[in-house]
C-alpha cells in the first residue's frame, strides 16, 4: 500500500535561523549595557569567520552576528544544520540553546554558566557542540553520521587543542556529508584554531 503523504523537506533559511538564534538569547536587563560592550569585543575577535559566514548565509546586517554572541559564527552555522544528522530531529538548535545547564549535557546554558567573556576561550565554538550532539545524542544519529563521528574515540594520545580541532573537523565533515556538500566549510587558515 502506498503512503498517503508525500515527504516534504522544510528547510529554515540560514539568515532566518541566525535571527532566531539571536532572539533566543535573553540578556538580563541589568547586564544589557555591559553585555553589548562585551559582545562587540567578542564579535571583533572573529572578523574573518563572521564575514565569511555572513556571505554564505546572505546576512547583510552585522547586528545579527553580534546578537548570536557568545556563539562563534561557524558554530551557529553548524548548529543550524545539525538537526539533519538526527533520525527524527530530536536535537535541534533550540534544544541546544534551551537545554538545562547540567554538566552531563554541556549545551549552551552550561556554557554560559561555566565560561565568560574574559576566559581564554570565551566563544562557544564548533568543537563544543560535540558533547550535546555526539556524546549525549549518538544513539539518535543516522548511521552515516555516526560512522564519521565514531572516528574520534579511536584517536589516542591527543593534546586538548588537537582534540578540539579534530572534533570540529569531524562535525563539519559529518554535516557536509549529510547536506551533500552544501555547507561552505572553513578554509585551511581557520582549521588550525577552532576559535578564530
Regions from the language model: what does each represent?
Residues 194-196:
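Hydrophobic alpha-helical segments, chiefly the membrane-spanning helices
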Residues 1-110, 122:
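Conserved P-loop NTPase catalytic core
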Residues 37-40, 44, 147-150, 170:
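Polar/charged alpha-helical tracts
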Residues 150-188, 192:
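Terminal-proximal interaction/regulatory segments of ATP-powered molecular machines
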Residues 47-56, 65-70, 136-147, 180-185:
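Active-site-adjacent bridging/hinge elements
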Residues 92-155:
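Long, low-complexity, charged/polar intrinsically disordered regions in eukaryotic proteins
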Residues 67, 71, 137, 157-165:
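Secondary-structure capping and boundary motifs in well-ordered enzyme cores
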